[in-house]
Amino acid sequence: GSQFGKGKGQLIGVGAGALLGAILGNQIGAGMDEQDRRLAELTSQRALETTPSGTSIEWRNPDNGNYGYVTPSKTYKNST
């Protein structure tokens, strides 16, 4: 959304993109059970901590066959 338009048009594009993302994310999340969400959360944490930027890692629920991928776009390591 933010790549297109200028001024108010650009802001509308950003808002529309955020709204669409929220709607799609909510629909996807509604199809996930508690174990799916747990696996996705654990995989997200592992991806952020150990996976190089641009590398996808998969989570898969063996009970229902649901799966997904997490791809960090930029990773940082805290020196503390």
From Swiss-Prot:
UniProt keywords, alphabetically: Cell outer membrane, Lipoprotein, Membrane
Organism lineage: Bacteria, Pseudomonadati, Pseudomonadota, Alphaproteobacteria, Rickettsiales
A GO CC term attached to the entry: cell outer membrane
Acetylation found in the keyword field: no
Region (Disordered): 47-80
Biological source species: Rickettsia canadensis
Record protein name field: 17 kDa surface antigen
Alphabetical list of Pfam families matching this protein: Rick_17kDa_Anti
Membrane topology: Lipid-anchor
